[in-house]
Regions:
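Membrane-embedded multi-pass helical conduit in multi-pass membrane proteins
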Residues: 11-34, 58-60, 328-421
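Cytosolic juxtamembrane regulatory segments of multi-pass membrane proteins
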Residues: 64-77, 399-413, 432-454
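Hydrophobic alpha-helical transmembrane segments and immediately flanking/interface helices
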Residues: 97-106, 424-444
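Serine/threonine-rich intrinsically disordered cytosolic regulatory regions enriched
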Residues: 448-490
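Short hydrophobic helices that act as membrane-entry/anchoring signals
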Residues: 5, 16, 203, 207-218, ...
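N-terminal membrane-anchoring/stem segments of glycan-assembly enzymes
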Residues: 1-62, 404-419, 464, 468, ...
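Non-transmembrane catalytic domains and loops of membrane-associated enzymes and transporters
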Residues: 58-321, 492
């Protein structure tokens, strides 16, 4: 129904535009048509379905050698252990787990942080489960170098990149491998679920922003097999794609500065140049979102700057006839129209005469669009979130639209003019951990009756991107004891 409704609406806009070119009708018809077309992803996102496999395809996937890489830097030790435990507990056993400590150090005392207890437990547990586990410590050079320290020469078939404070659902790896039944698929994005969705008003707002993106914009891109950015929280890659760019990926530069952000979009672009990139909504990982404005502001600016810089790479390397080229162009056009259209309306006396009706039309359309997007909340059901919570999120979805317009849009413009700050990544000065109350187990259900379950017990770890200090937040904790290549990436 969303697709049919969008088609009817598009025809109406096209007719209005044709009439306007005859000298009659609304002089802004073309601008409204373009604005409408930029919402292409909303109806398309409803066409995404989790990829499934036949018995024969599953046997082939079961033969793949899977390597999980976990970079670590000044990590909260209990959170790191929870992350590794979630990898051990996968229904589809992985073959290798490669942990790389990127020179963790306590800056207050200038002494190395080596995680001796967790390292010993990890290596012993890996041996007991007959999984090849390694734990290396390197000089601090950043996440990309930590990843390629082991992946450049790893002989695996599939590489899984996982943040060290993420918690995998038990079926995450099994589900994430299924799209690789298609030999043209080069990378798979996991589905990121907000864990601390009800902590405060900000996390509720971010939940309204995250879910429509992961199950909206990214889902629409997946239908086209052109997911532009995998989440660094959880992503799967054909190993040859990553190995082919060793030495280039970790040394990317922009305006002579090393790129310390958007590593995930770089790997995704490599995959897009070699084949298809998709999203698997049933491969679920739980993550934490900021609980303070300062944390959220700095995280958003970092992402926006990195994405804007990556736009230059997309437009340079993506085929001009493909969706990978035009999607970032559409994003820039949408940003431009958000500034130009209001100015044009104010400058046109004819439009000013109908200002009240025009404003009401815009408001009604915005409400409809935001509510249509918000219906994606019902695509993921959790037993730690009552149905009433999702109903309220849908009803309040227009607030997210206002947030995008009056908060994120100005931030995006500022990020564009300060995009040269790509090397500001910071370092953690300390690790601060506190326990939170225990909860019962939580489950996540998808429309096709896929149910995922994780134990939810206290933990504390969320990194502030400016101070790099950890914040006290609840995250799950187990109850058990404890191929195309191109020039090196520089843009002057």
């Amino acid at each position: 129904m969303p697709v049919a409704g969008a088609a009817v609406w598009a025809i109406e806009h096209a007719i209005a535009t044709a009439v306007a070119f005859t000298g009659h009708g609304n002089s802004m018809a073309l601008a409204w048509l373009v604005s409408f077309l930029l919402l292409w992803w909303i109806p398309l996102s409803w066409m995404e379905r989790p990829v499934t496999t036949t018995t024969r395809q599953q046997r082939i996937l079961d033969e793949l050698v899977v390597t999980v890489q976990v970079p670590v830097y000044n990590e909260d030790e209990p959170a790191l252990r929870d992350c590794l435990q979630s990898v051990f507990d996968q229904s589809r056993t992985v073959d290798r787990i490669r942990v790389v400590d990127d020179g963790s150090i306590d800056k207050a005392t200038n002494t190395p942080i080596t995680y001796p207890a967790t390292k010993a437990w990890f290596l012993e547990e890996a041996s007991r489960r007959r999984i090849h586990g390694t734990w290396d410590r390197t000089v601090n050079r950043g996440k990309r170098h930590a990843q390629m320290h082991v992946l450049a020469d790893d002989p695996g078939d599939i590489f899984v990149t996982l943040d060290s404070d993420s918690i995998l659902d038990r079926e995450a790896v099994a589900e994430g491998l299924k799209p690789f039944r298609d030999p043209n698929v080069r990378s798979v994005a996991g589905c990121v679920i907000v864990l601390n969705s009800r902590s405060n008003l900000l996390t509720r707002m971010l939940c309204m922003l995250y879910t429509p993106f992961t199950r909206g914009f990214r889902s629409a891109q997946s239908v086209l097999k052109r997911v532009m950015v995998n989440s660094g929280t959880l992503a799967f890659y054909r190993a040859d794609v990553v190995r082919a760019h060793a030495g280039i990926y970790e040394n990317e530069q922009f305006l002579g500065r090393p790129m310390q952000m958007n590593d995930d979009s770089m790997l995704t672009m490599y995959a897009m140049l070699a084949g298809d990139t998709v999203h698997q909504p049933s491969s679920i990982v739980f993550t934490l979102v900021p609980e303070t404005w300062k944390h959220y502001r700095n995280q958003s600016m970092r992402w926006m700057r990195g994405t804007f810089v990556r736009t230059f790479w997309w437009m340079k390397y993506m085929p001009v006839t493909g969706a990978g080229f035009w999607m970032p162009v559409a994003e820039l056009l949408q940003l431009l129209l958000s500034v130009v259209i209001p100015v044009a309306l104010v400058a046109d006396p004819a439009q000013r005469a109908h200002a009240s009706s025009l404003i009401w039309s815009v408001v009604l359309v915005a409400l409809a669009m935001n509510w249509l997007i918000a219906l994606r909340f019902f695509m993921v059901a959790r037993d730690d979130e009552p149905l009433s919570f999702h109903v309220w999120l849908v009803l309040l979805a227009p607030l997210a639209g206002l947030w995008r317009m009056f908060v994120l849009r100005p931030m995006h413009l500022y990020a564009m003019v300060t995009c040269w700050k790509v090397s500001n990544w910071g370092t953690r000065d300390a690790v601060e951990v506190a326990a939170a109350p225990a909860f019962e187990d939580a489950a996540v259900s998808l429309p096709d009756d896929v149910t995922v379950r994780i134990p939810r017990i206290p933990v504390a770890k969320l990194l502030d991107p400016e101070t790099e200090k950890t914040l006290t937040l609840p995250i799950p904790r187990p109850r058990e004891p404890v191929n195309a290549q191109f020039e090196p990436e520089t843009l002057a």
